[in-house]
């Protein structure tokens, strides 16, 4: 058996519901459109793609020509569609019923638009908890991608992560593909020819090897310097041409690779996400300590050895770090329960759409990008939640005054409402007004955010980092840039 390597190459495209049209249009102009038009010219370059539901709808309406190219690539067997949660929720953070509903909604949307129902799914922010397995399996999903870091944390050796594994929860089976961290940091930042040579180096005589990549499509045009690098300087074309010219590399789909090779075995992954999330989800002081610990081991050459044990926080930590995010989340859970309790005849598609929009992950956390700190993203969640509550009250009236601990923080909240507004007061020493919602405007006037120290403040004295290794460009993870010099007034 000659030495070969299967390249499983996937890209993920997402914009949060409520994002500015100008932002989405720029993303399409610089990333989604050029990417699709480039890969279209290479029918033999098989790739996988995931679009979140709100973004997919936007592109189908505003950019039908580029979506027609994708439809043709799906039909000719070049593009493999991935599903997932329709409005890009962190599946672990929503109830089972909504996990199934969201996954099914996106699968339905893809089938209507492209004539194919996905068998693989993108896991939002690669947040893994074993509890998501039953909903994925029950929704017709057979495999997902997560980071190789997840497997390393489970004790798997890195050199074994060149194929798919199998897990189960409550006797529901799901196959797992480990995304290569090495490829995530090389593509598209290292020179194309160097990346192709790296892929070729993975080929092993007598052994089936898959090189697995699945990451944000925004790295191909939206991240700093990438538009000129990927399209102006032809990185993507050079990479594809190098892959297709290689006698060693075969572009493949996840589904066909899974059918061609047996599972590498059973695995049970710990609750985790990608490596960077472990730092971002910690409180600022602890994130500083964690970063220092990682730096110490890297400086002393022991990082790879101890990496499985150098885990930080988990995604849910954001809900304990930010009471504002926790309040949104627990209000959303309450609305989900009310929708589920309705008789089927009273439960409408509009209610489900608003519920799913309120579960969009972006406004509940933040890392490299603004997330929770962007008021228009929080506003979109609140708009959906308040509009949904208004619809629910019309068919399932509530008492005008209620007292309960909505957000599970140990304090009772008093909810006072009529047909026009709702005021929520916390029954503590401050009697703080934690929500003031207008149903006519579908707006929460109490949607504010307390200023807090963040872990990245430690970089304030750093200079902009734009120097890359190996003649490529720097990843956004390696950059520190300011709109203006930081001074005392800031």
Language model features: what each stretch is:
Residues 4-96, 101-102, 117-123, 142-148, ...:
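Short, well-structured secondary-structure segments
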Residues 33-35, 61-76, 155-169, 193-202:
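Alpha-helical scaffolding within the catalytic cores
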Residues 90, 146-161, 176-190, 194-198:
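Positively charged, amphipathic and often flexible ligand-engagement surfaces
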Residues 26-29, 97, 101-104, 422-490:
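Acidic-aromatic substrate-binding/catalytic surfaces of carbohydrate-active enzymes
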Residues 98-125, 200-217:
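CE4/NodB-like, metal-dependent polysaccharide N-deacetylase domain
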Residues 32-39, 67-71, 100-110, 133, ...:
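Generic structural signal for well-ordered alpha-helices
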Residues 2-33, 40-42, 161-166, 170-174, ...:
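Active-site and substrate-binding clefts of carbohydrate-active enzymes
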Residues 97, 112, 117, 122-167, ...:
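Gly/Pro-rich turn-and-neighbor structural signature
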């Amino acid at each position: 058996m000659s030495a070969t390597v299967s390249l499983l190459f996937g890209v993920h495209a997402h914009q949060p519901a409520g994002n500015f049209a100008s932002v989405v249009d720029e993303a399409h102009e610089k990333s989604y459109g050029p990417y699709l038009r480039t890969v279209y010219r290479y029918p033999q370059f098989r790739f996988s793609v995931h679009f979140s539901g709100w973004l997919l709808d936007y592109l189908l309406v505003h950019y039908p020509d580029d979506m027609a190219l994708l439809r043709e690539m799906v039909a000719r067997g070049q593009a493999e569609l991935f599903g997932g949660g329709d409005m890009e929720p962190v599946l672990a953070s929503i109830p089972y019923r909504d996990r199934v509903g969201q996954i099914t909604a996106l699968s339905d949307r893809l089938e209507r638009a492209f004539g194919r129902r996905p068998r693989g799914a993108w896991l939002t922010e690669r947040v893994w908890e074993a509890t998501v397995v039953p909903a994925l399996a029950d929704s017709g999903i057979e495999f997902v991608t997560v980071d190789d870091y997840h497997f390393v944390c489970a004790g798997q050796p890195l050199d074994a992560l060149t194929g798919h594994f199998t897990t189960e929860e409550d006797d529901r089976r799901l196959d797992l593909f480990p995304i290569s961290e090495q490829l995530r940091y090389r593509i598209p930042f290292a020179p194309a020819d160097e990346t192709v040579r790296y892929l070729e180096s993975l080929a092993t005589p007598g052994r089936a090897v898959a090189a697995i990549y699945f990451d944000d499509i925004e790295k191909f045009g939206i991240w700093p310097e990438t538009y000129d690098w990927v399209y102006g300087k032809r990185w993507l074309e050079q990479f594809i041409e190098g892959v297709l010219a290689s006698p060693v590399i075969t572009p493949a789909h996840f589904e066909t690779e899974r059918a061609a090779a047996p599972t590498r075995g059973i695995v049970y992954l710990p609750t985790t996400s990608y490596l960077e999330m472990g730092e971002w989800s910690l409180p600022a002081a602890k994130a500083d300590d964690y970063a220092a610990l990682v730096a110490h081991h890297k400086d002393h050459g022991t990082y790879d050895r101890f990496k499985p044990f150098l885990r930080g926080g988990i995604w849910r930590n954001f809900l304990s770090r930010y009471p504002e995010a926790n309040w949104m989340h627990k209000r959303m859970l309450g609305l989900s329960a009310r929708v589920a309790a309705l008789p089927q005849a009273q439960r409408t598609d509009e209610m489900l759409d608003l519920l799913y929009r309120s579960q969009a992950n972006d406004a509940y956390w933040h890392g490299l990008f603004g997330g929770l700190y962007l008021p228009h993203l929080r506003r979109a969640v609140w708009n959906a939640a308040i509009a949904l509550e208004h619809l629910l009250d019309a068919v399932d009236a509530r008492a005008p005054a209620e007292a309960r601990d909505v957000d599970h923080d140990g304090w009772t909240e008093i909810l006072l409402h009529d047909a026009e507004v709702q005021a929520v007061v916390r029954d503590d020493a401050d009697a703080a007004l934690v929500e003031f919602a207008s149903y006519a405007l579908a707006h929460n006037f109490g949607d504010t955010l307390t200023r807090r120290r963040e872990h990245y403040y430690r970089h304030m004295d750093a200079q902009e980092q734009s120097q890359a290794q190996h003649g490529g460009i720097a990843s956004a993870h390696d950059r520190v840039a300011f709109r203006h010099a930081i001074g005392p007034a800031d």
